[in-house]
Amino acid sequence: MHVIVLGSGVIGTTTAYYLARQGAQVTVLERRAGPADETSYGNAGQVSPGYSTPWAAPGIPLKALKWMFQKHAPLAIRADGSFYQWRWLAAMLANCSAGRYSVNKERMLRLAEYSRDCLRTLRADTGIQYEQRTQGTLQLFRTAAQMEAARRDIAVLEECGVPYELLDRNRLPTAEPALARALDKLAGGLRLPNDETGDCRRFTLQLADKAKALGVQFRFNQQVEGLDVRGGQVAGVRVGGEQLAADCYVAAFGSYTRGFLRPLGLDLPVYPVKGYSLTIPMTDESAAPVSTILDETYKVAVTRFDQRIRVGGMAELAGFDLRLKEARRKTLELVVNDLSPGSGAVEQAEFWTGLRPMTPDSTPIIGATKYGNLFLNTGHGTLGWTMACGSGQLVADQVCGRQPAIRADDLALSRYGAGGQAGGGVARAQHNAA
């Protein structure tokens, strides 16, 4: 069976790898010069199932209003001139009830825990190295109110069997010794010992090499012009003046997947949520985290790689705007200087931004469509790295007709009531991802 995977970020590359492991002939089409060159390039570095929490949550509407007037707010909404932006926001607000939050968090935890297990198996099988650390992660609370909210939230962790430790202020240095310098700013923390960290881009580059060794063909610098469909099936991909045909197709274009598939009558509720990061050369190991610390107030993570510190987070809803904004850099600098002062040469940092493909319920869209040979793997939001291996394995199982190891039907596009029935004739989808 020949499968074409569209996109070579961490999601597309893991999908290609797992397909090849199951014996498929795989071709990956990518418009950039190599894998992990966009959203997977500079993310926060967390593989954190325990922090798989929906952005759509009780209290978020009121918080969003307050954040509009804060200088270092974790969320900013800027009109992009489209009606779709407001429709997407309305759908997100509809998911802010306690009931929807509980359902969505369970889905996210289920996939994220499975994905971490898949990553561990892959690491054992291949020996892949990507500056990973398996020392857990620590969410930091600056206020008693945040601590109390965490106590309410851990009920879901207990239901899903996720180990955790709720730490008061004085116990924080037992998990992260460098925090002894910042205790006066903190109320406590939530430690998740089974979470991990690592450089997503390095992982993706190495996994692409391992996929090539299994026979996967990567075609870079390819501008995908569209999909042709006939009789309820994808007939081929138009790229560079030629049509490439396969038995099955997997769309993993991240934030651009929605625009690519709309001409086919597939309305994916995916919106680009802009995030930022700094990658800082480490200068004082004793002042740096041993793993990841996550500032709950600013929604910013500070992650330790080998000789670098990655500071990433925040969310802007502003369409496909990729401009770097100095105000966001200052927020990242504020957090790292506050929690890990003197740990790195902040003035030498690489400043980066990327677009995370987010759904209104924060759960990715994985699985079949109304076209019998077209599958989706997108919409992971801020958890693409966390969920990548599990998502790739699920899609590979579905494409190859195998029973997935976990429930996956509620991750499909059909949960939104979208798609309908494929019609006859010829339809074309265009990849307008400039």
Curated annotation (Swiss-Prot):
Cofactor(s) the record lists: FAD
The keyword Flavoprotein is assigned to this record: yes
Positions of FAD binding: 3-17
Reactions listed under catalytic activity: a D-alpha-amino acid + A + H2O = a 2-oxocarboxylate + AH2 + NH4(+)
Biological process (GO), any one: D-alanine catabolic process
Keywords from the named record: FAD, Flavoprotein, Oxidoreductase
EC nos: 1.4.99.-
Pfam families the record matches: DAO
GO cellular component entries: cytoplasm; plasma membrane
Molecular function GO labels: D-amino-acid dehydrogenase activity
Family named by the database record: Belongs to the DadA oxidoreductase family.
Purpose of the protein: Oxidative deamination of D-amino acids.
Protein's name according to its UniProt entry: D-amino acid dehydrogenase
Organism: Bordetella parapertussis (strain 12822 / ATCC BAA-587 / NCTC 13253)
